[in-house]
């Protein structure tokens, strides 16, 4: 198998990172970025029973916790079971109790992930217009701007603008989720304000056409996020970490541009966000977007590093992570000249102990997949399949092998067809590929 990079000194990546406002430290500069795992409970009939972490999901995070990742971010925790990104999302409903099966399973996940010293953070989110139309025919958003695309077999209904009362409920939902997670033993949360989800829909001029106090100027468009931050402060202990994920650039007219991202980051620092994770893009196949292809072809890794340099240049207290395209240790070390930490997502699905092996100088970087990395839906499906393999203690399928990629492609196509007609929990979970796969080591 081919790997990215050449041997370099990885020690800068092993340095602790202190979060100024929470007065907490991550043991190193790696961040496992949030992904949609789709391994929680699902039921058609009873929304209140949706989104309870499964044994498989807990085992996945136990494995990542063994890998010496500095900060581990769970994927896309929904705050409303009727507004979800995908079936199988972890969910904290607004009436969730601080006891019972849901609370216990979230607590078990946190304990498993942090058992070896990693920080565990939950990414909390509302999909807004990016909820499947067969799940929510009347989604809410900043405005009634439709999402004209298809993602993982899903289409999306035309949203309506959220009322001020609904906005208040959203703020309460985020704050309740943070309190729930704090009590369950999490070190912090990350607000998901990137990739086209609801908070991003309020930030972006492309989707926010409001004329009230939540629309127009950037000050108004970021108001919802800052009100959520204030509400969380009232519900959690002082040392609870609060971060946020934003797009540093968007591939659409009137989307977030670097100047706005820079202004936004200054406001986030002023309102005591501990870190910002910079990413880019929305629900759209990257192979269809010329601007995205240009950025990715220009930089073979660290796709948004040039933009990040401008965005974070004025920050003094809020820490910054950059996620998107890092594969070589050399590229990661170089990235630390611009940002404070390095976010990785899909590489940890292929190699859950990647961080451990890099920090010990055992490898020069991540395995290079032969799969087309611009094929958004296929790469997402592959990551979901690998995460479920990890949750079942099976070595993830090797995407540097064309035979394995062919198998993943066939499995992904079958998955999309199956979940279109079968509404059971098992049908919505990623396919479980085992075959001749070796058991996953319990030690990094």
Curated annotation (Swiss-Prot):
Pfam families documented for this protein: Oxidored_FMN (PF00724)
Transmembrane segments: none
Sites where the protein binds substrate: 192-195
One GO term describing the cellular component: cytosol
Enzyme Commission number(s) of this protein: 1.-.-.-
PANTHER family found in the cross-reference section: BINDING OXIDOREDUCTASE, PUTATIVE (AFU_ORTHOLOGUE AFUA_2G08260)-RELATED, NADH:FLAVIN OXIDOREDUCTASE_NADH OXIDASE N-TERMINAL DOMAIN-CONTAINING PROTEIN
Protein role: NADH-dependent flavin oxidoreductase; part of the gene cluster that mediates the biosynthesis of aflatoxins, a group of polyketide-derived furanocoumarins, and part of the most toxic and carcinogenic compounds among the known mycotoxins. The four major aflatoxins produced by A.parasiticus are aflatoxin B1 (AFB1), aflatoxin B2 (AFB2), aflatoxin G1 (AFG1) and aflatoxin G2 (AFG2). Within the aflatoxin pathway, the NADH-dependent flavin oxidoreductase nadA is specifically required for the last steps in which OMST is converted specifically to aflatoxin G1.
Record key words, sorted: Cytoplasm, FAD, Flavoprotein, FMN, NAD, Oxidoreductase
Gene3D superfamilies: Aldolase class I
Gene Ontology annotations of biological process type: aflatoxin biosynthetic process
GO molecular function: flavin reductase (NADH) activity; FMN binding
Reported consequences of knocking out the gene: Does not show any remarkable difference in production of B-group aflatoxin (AFB1 and AFB2) compared to the wild-type but leads to significant decrease in production of G-group aflatoxins (AFG1 and AFG2). Leads to the accumulation of a yellow AFG1 precursor called NADA.
UniProt name for this protein: NADH-dependent flavin oxidoreductase nadA
Superkingdom, taxonomy of origin: Eukaryota
Induction comment from the UniProt entry of this chain: Expression is regulated by the aflatoxin cluster-specific transcription factor aflR.
Chain intervals for the UniProt region annotation (Disordered): 127-149
Residues binding FMN, per UniProt: 37-40, 123, 345-346
Family: Belongs to the NADH:flavin oxidoreductase/NADH oxidase family.
Cellular compartments annotated: Cytoplasm, Cytosol
InterPro entries: Aldolase_TIM (IPR013785), NADH_flavin_oxidoreductase (IPR051799), OxRdtase_FMN_N (IPR001155)
């Amino acid at each position: 198998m081919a790997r990215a990079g050449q041997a370099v000194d990885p020690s800068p990546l092993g340095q602790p990172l202190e979060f100024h406002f929470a007065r907490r430290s991550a043991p190193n500069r790696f961040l496992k970025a949030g992904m949609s795992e789709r391994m929680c409970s699902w039921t058609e009939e009873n929304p209140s029973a949706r989104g309870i972490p499964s044994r498989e999901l807990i085992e996945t995070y136990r494995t990542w916790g063994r890998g010496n990742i500095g900060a581990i971010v769970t994927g896309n925790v929904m705050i409303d079971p009727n507004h979800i990104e995908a079936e199988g999302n972890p969910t904290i409903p607004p009436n969730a109790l601080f006891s019972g099966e849901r609370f216990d399973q979230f607590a078990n996940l946190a304990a498993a992930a942090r058992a070896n010293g990693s920080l565990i953070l939950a990414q909390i989110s509302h999909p807004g217009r990016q909820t499947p139309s067969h799940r929510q025919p009347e989604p809410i958003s900043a405005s009634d701007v439709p999402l004209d695309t298809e993602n993982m077999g899903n289409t999306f209904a035309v949203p309506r603008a959220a009322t001020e009362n609904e906005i208040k409920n959203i703020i309460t939902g985020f704050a309740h989720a943070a309190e729930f997670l704090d009590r369950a033993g999490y070190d912090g949360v990350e607000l998901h304000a990137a990739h086209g989800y609801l908070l991003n829909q309020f930030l972006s001029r492309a989707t926010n056409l409001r004329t009230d106090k939540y629309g127009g100027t950037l000050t108004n468009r970021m108001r919802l996020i800052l009100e959520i931050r204030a509400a969380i402060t009232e519900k959690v202990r002082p040392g609870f970490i609060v971060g946020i994920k934003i797009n540093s650039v968007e591939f659409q007219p009137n989307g977030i541009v670097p100047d706005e991202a820079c202004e936004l980051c200054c406001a986030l620092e002023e309102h005591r966000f501990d870190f910002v994770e910079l990413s880019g893009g929305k629900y759209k196949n990257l192979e269809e977007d010329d601007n995205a292809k240009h950025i990715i072809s220009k930089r073979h890794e660290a796709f948004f590093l040039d933009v990040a340099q401008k965005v974070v240049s004025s920050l003094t207290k809020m820490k910054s992570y950059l996620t998107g395209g890092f594969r070589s240790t050399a590229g990661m070390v170089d990235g630390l000249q611009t940002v404070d930490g390095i976010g990785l997502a899909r590489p940890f699905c292929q190699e859950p102990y990647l961080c451990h092996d890099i920090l010990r100088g055992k490898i020069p970087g991540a395995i290079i997949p032969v799969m087309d990395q611009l094929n958004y839906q296929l790469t997402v499906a592959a990551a979901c399949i690998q995460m479920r393999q990890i949750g079942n203690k099976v070595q993830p399928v090797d995407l540097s092998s064309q035979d394995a990629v062919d198998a993943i492609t066939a499995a992904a196509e079958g998955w999309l067809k199956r979940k279109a007609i079968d509404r059971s929990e098992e049908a919505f979970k990623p396919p479980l590929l085992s075959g001749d796969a070796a058991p996953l080591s319990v030690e990094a």
